[in-house]
Amino acid sequence: HSQGTFTNDYSKYLDTRRAQDFVQWLMSTKRSGGITXXXXXXXXHADGTYTSDVSSYLQDQAAKKFVTWLKQGQDRRE
């Protein structure tokens, strides 16, 4: 149950973070006067790649912390 709760909370965090990143990107695009369609596709792809890389990194870190937490819990039971 705790793993499901952790996963659900983490998924919500990632969704919120992606939404914040997208809003920030929109705001910076508006401030800069917009971008061309070709540059928009390249920038959106780069932003998506960056977001994907960050998400993967955060998921890896969360998984490592969770495994460590599980191991510590097992040590206490023994």
Swiss-Prot record:
Secreted in keyword set: yes
A molecular-function term among this protein's GO annotations: hormone activity
Miscellaneous comment: X's in the sequence were included by homology with American goosefish sequences.
Gene Ontology terms: cellular component: extracellular region
Name of the protein this chain belongs to: Pro-glucagon
SMART domains reported for this sequence: GLUCA
Family per record: Belongs to the glucagon family.
One Pfam family this sequence matches: Hormone_2
Subcellular location: Secreted
Keyword vocabulary terms for this entry: Hormone, Secreted
Expression triggers: Produced in the A cells of the islets of Langerhans in response to a drop in blood sugar concentration.
Species, as recorded: Atractosteus spatula
Cross-referenced PROSITE patterns: GLUCAGON
InterPro entries, per database record: Glucagon, Glucagon_GIP_secretin_VIP
